[in-house]
Regions:
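A Rossmann-like FAD-binding core segment of flavoenzymes
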Residues: 55-119
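FAD-binding core/adjacent interface of flavoenzyme oxidoreductases
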Residues: 1-37, 110-118
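Short glycine-/acidic-enriched loop or helix-start segments at secondary-structure transitions
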Residues: 3-6, 48-49, 71, 103
Length: 119
């Protein structure tokens, strides 16, 4: 999968999801955190977020497009999906750009969005 050139992408606690091994690493790491930020509102991210929500994690999805699944859903379908996911406890930052992943001692502590919001 595409990894955008974001400062801090190499910190501990930042993952890509390409293989089943990646999924296992994410699951193992998630046991030690309560908050998860998913960069990208695509199908794999949403599915991963769903699994993490079921395990009690706070999940925030950062998507650069103004809606989820822009290649798969029209505006109405994306809005309905977002409503359903929000009812499940998801949080969204749409039309948002990730500027930097921040951390201390090489471990992720947050994500800075364009505009200055820190997740």
């Amino acid at each position: 999968s595409f990894v955008p050139p974001i400062k801090g992408y190499d910190l501990r606690g930042v993952f890509t999801l390409r293989t089943i091994e990646d999924a296992h690493e994410i699951s193992t790491y998630a046991n030690n955190t309560d908050n998860v930020v998913l960069i990208g509102g695509g199908l794999l991210g949403i599915e991963t977020g769903y699994a993490l929500r079921k395990s009690g994690k706070k999940v925030t999805v950062v998507e650069s497009f103004p809606r989820l699944l822009p290649r798969q859903l029209d505006v109405d379908g994306a809005f309905r999906l977002q409503q359903i996911l929000e009812e499940m406890g998801f949080h969204f930052r749409l039309s948002a750009k990730t500027l930097e992943i921040i951390g201390d001692n090489q471990t992720t502590t947050g994500v800075i969005l364009e505009g200055g919001e820190v997740l």
